[in-house]
Amino acid sequence: MSRCRLIYSSISSKEIVSNDTIKALVKRSAENNLRDKITGLLLLSGDRFLQVLEGDSKAVNRLYGKIYQDPRHREVELISFESIDVHYFETWGMRLVDLYDLPTHPRRFLMDKYEHVDGNIQIPTRLHEVFSLLLDAKTLCHPSVP
């Protein structure tokens, strides 16, 4: 079984505006991902999503295809797709990190490290910065989770 990590970004369509809607979607996604043995993190900054998915290559590709076709996403952009031996989000069925709702200290740390506009952290364009943001979000937002 080939394992992979896929990272993409997108912009929320107008259909997803409330945090309650997003949280319900993440809950359903976590259940589906558990079934499909996919793990990952969904980062939200304003109307922008950054998501990492890890798991079986076929399952991850199938899920990305659904996301790409989902009208709740606009401008879906594949950032990285790679085979992996090491999983960084192996215990996370799917977690939502809303950067706007972070406590002051973690939010300030991220705003000092990454570009931001109108209080929203910008999704980086360089792969190493994208991965750094995902790992920072994982560590700062859920430090007790490996």
Label each PLM-derived region with a short phrase.
Residues 1-146:
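Charge-rich, low-complexity N-terminal segments
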